[in-house]
Amino acid sequence: MELNDLQQTRYGKLQALQAAGIEPYPARVPQRTHTLTAVREQFSALVEANATVTIMGRLRQRRVMGKSAFAHLNDDHGAFQIFLSKADVGDEPFKHFVDLTDLGDIIAVTGTLFTTKMGEPSVHVTSWTMLSKAITPPPDKREGQFSDQEARQRQRYVDLSANPEVREIFRIRARLITAMRRYLDERGFLEVETPVLQGIYGGAAARPFTTHHNQLHQDLYLRIATELYLKRLIVGGFDGVYEIGKNFRNEGVDRTHNPEFTMIEVYQAYGDYESIMQLTEGMIRFAAEQIFNSTSIEYQGHQIELGGSWQRLTMRDAIFEKTGVDIRECREFDTLWEAIGEAGLKIERKPTWAKQVDELFSEFVEPELIQPTFITEYPQPLSPLAKRKADDPQFVERFELFMLGAEIANAFSELNDPFDQEQRFLEQGRDYAAGDDEAMQMDEDYLEALKVGMPPTGGLGIGIDRLCLLFTNQTTIREVIFFPHLRKQGEE
C-alpha cells in the first residue's frame, strides 16, 4: 500500500501504538453509555448523579497544555468536549494520547461530567481507548481543502465525515421516504417488491442495461421501471400497491439524471389520473409538513408553495401560452412544423408529430415551471400505457408534475384494454425497428394479465432523487445520492 508523507507519519504512530501494546483497531471495545447528543441533553441529571459515562467519536480539535489537554469528539449528531490530565489518566496513557493520536482518529473516553470555567460542558477523562487509527488526515476546511464538488462526490465518506450539513441532506432524504411510505401505508396501500432482473424491459421509454444469466443462457435487463409487474399485482386482486426501489436506465448523466436512481411507483385500483393527482398532491404536502412543519419551502431564491390546489394546465394550453402554437389545431407534423416556423421558434426538428410536441414543451415550457404544476393530456404516441381520452383519442389521460423546471412525477389512467395495448406494443415495435432504441418491447405475458381483467387503475411514478432537490435545496441530484455515477478519474 502506497502512503504519502502525511500518511507515513501517521503509520509510524500506529506502529508505536502497537509497540506499546495498544491495538489500533481492537476487536473488543468499551460499551458506549451515551451518544454525544444524549450526554448534552442529559448533562444536568448526569452531573447531579455523579454518573460515569463512556462516549465515542472522532477527534476533531485538540489542545495540549503541558500536563493537560482539551479535545472535541464528533459523532453522527454533534460534538462534545473532553478534558484529560496526566494526573487522572496516568503518565503513559497521557503521553500516548498526546504523542500518538491525530485529528480524525476514533477514540472512546470514560469519565465524569463537569463544566469548565468558560461554561463548556465536558467529560473529565479517567481512561481512553483507541478504536480506529486514521491514516489519512481529515481535510482542513479553513484552508478550503476538499471543497471541489467532484472530489466530494468521489469520496463521499470523507465528505460526510467532514461536513455535518451533508449528513443532514441525507437525513432529510430518509425522512422524505419515510413520510411517503407512512402516507401510503395509512391509506391501505401494500408495499411490495418486484424483479430487478427482467427478461423483458418495459414501463418507460429508456435504454436498458443488459446482463446475462450463465446457467439459464438467458439475456436479462436491469429494470427501467416497476410498472408492468405492479399492474400484474392489481390484476391479482390487490386494491393498492407501491414499491420504492432502484431503476436503471442507460442514459446520460446530468443535473437531473443518474443511470441508477430511486423511484416510488404507486397503483390504485378503481382510480384514475384525477384521483392520482389528489394522492400525489397530498403525499408530497404531507412529507413537507412532517419534515418542516410547513407547506412552504425555500428553494434557490424561490418560495415553493405546496399548500392549496396546485396549478393544472393541459399540454395544449401550456404550449400555446408560451409559444402561440396550438397543437390541437396542428394535428399533423407538417402543419405543426409550419406553425413553429411562423412563430419564429428555433427548435430541433423531430421525426414525428408527437415527438415534436414533446420537444416544444421541453424547450419552451418545462424550464418555466417552478411552482408545482400538473401538465395533463399528452399525445397518445408518447404514452403507450395510458388510456385515451374519450372525447379526443389523439390524447391520453396522463399528467406529469413539474417543479423547479423539471419533471418530478408521471402518472396516468392505466390502459386496461388488452387489444388496444397490443396495438400500442406493435407500434412501439415498429418504432424500435426504425431506430428508436427507447421504444418498448412486446410483453406477451403482460397482455395475458390484462386478458384476465385489470380494474380501472391510476398509476404514479415519482423520482425520489429529484424530489429531494426541493426538500434539501440542492441543484443537482449528485448531491442527494450517496454515491452518484461519475466518469473515471482522468477522463474528460
Swiss-Prot record:
Top-level taxon of origin: Bacteria
Reactions catalysed: tRNA(Lys) + L-lysine + ATP = L-lysyl-tRNA(Lys) + AMP + diphosphate
Pfam families: tRNA-synt_2, tRNA_anti-codon
Entry note: cofactor: Binds 3 Mg(2+) ions per subunit.
One GO BP annotation of this record: lysyl-tRNA aminoacylation
Residues involved in Mg(2+) 1 binding: 400, 407
Residues that bind Mg(2+) 2: 407
Primary residence: cytoplasm
Entry keyword annotation includes Mitochondrion: no
Keywords in alphabetical order: Aminoacyl-tRNA synthetase, ATP-binding, Cytoplasm, Ligase, Magnesium, Metal-binding, Nucleotide-binding, Protein biosynthesis
GO molecular function annotations of the record: ATP binding; lysine-tRNA ligase activity; magnesium ion binding; tRNA binding
Keyword Aminoacyl-tRNA synthetase assigned: yes
Assigned EC number: 6.1.1.6
Cellular component aspect of the GO annotation: cytosol
Essential cofactor(s): Mg(2+)
Top EC class of this enzyme: ligase
PANTHER family cross-referenced by the UniProt entry: LYSINE--TRNA LIGASE, CHLOROPLASTIC_MITOCHONDRIAL (PTHR42918:SF15), LYSYL-TRNA SYNTHETASE (PTHR42918)
Subunit structure: Homodimer.
Family per record: Belongs to the class-II aminoacyl-tRNA synthetase family.
Protein name according to UniProt: Lysine--tRNA ligase
Phylogenetic classification of the source organism: Bacteria, Bacillati, Chloroflexota, Chloroflexia, Herpetosiphonales
Gene (name only): lysS
